[in-house]
Amino acid sequence: MAITKDQTGKLSAQVYALVRACPKGRVTTYGWLAGAVGYPRGARMIGWIMSATPANLNVPAHRVISKEGVLTGSKAFGAKDRMRTLLEEDGVSFEPDGRVDMKRFGWDPRLDLNPDELREVLDSAQTLRVNPPDTLLRLLNDDPASPFKLSDPL
C-alpha cells in the first residue's frame, strides 16, 4: 500500500500535533508517537518524519527521544548537548548515565490522554499545513522498515 504526498503531509501533521501536545518537562518516544497515530511498529517512520520537521511549526522536537531514554536525535540540534540543554530548560533531569528516567518523565499519548483528548489532538493536525519533502515520501514508500512497505503483499 503506497502512501501519497497528501497522506504523508497529514500523517506528519498528526505527529507534529502530538509532539506539540507533549507537556513541558516531559518526553515522548518515537514508538509511543507511532502507536498514537496507528502504526505501533513505526518508530523509525516517526524518526524520518521528525527529521523533516519544518521550523515554522514550532514543534518541540527535543522532547522526542528513544524508548531507552537516550537522546538519539541530538545531532539535529546542531551544537553538542543542545538537545539536553533544551530538555533541562524544560525541567527534565538526567540519570548519571545520561539517560532520561522514562518512568518519571515519559509521556505516552495513548496512556496520558483519554481517547477524546487524543482524538482532539489528532484532529487539531488539520490546521497544520505540511508539505513533506520528496525524500520522506520515498522513505515511507520504499524503505523495508516502513509500515507502508511492510504492508505490501509478498
What are these regions (language model features)?
Residues 2-154:
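Nucleic acid-binding interface residues in structured DNA/RNA-binding domains
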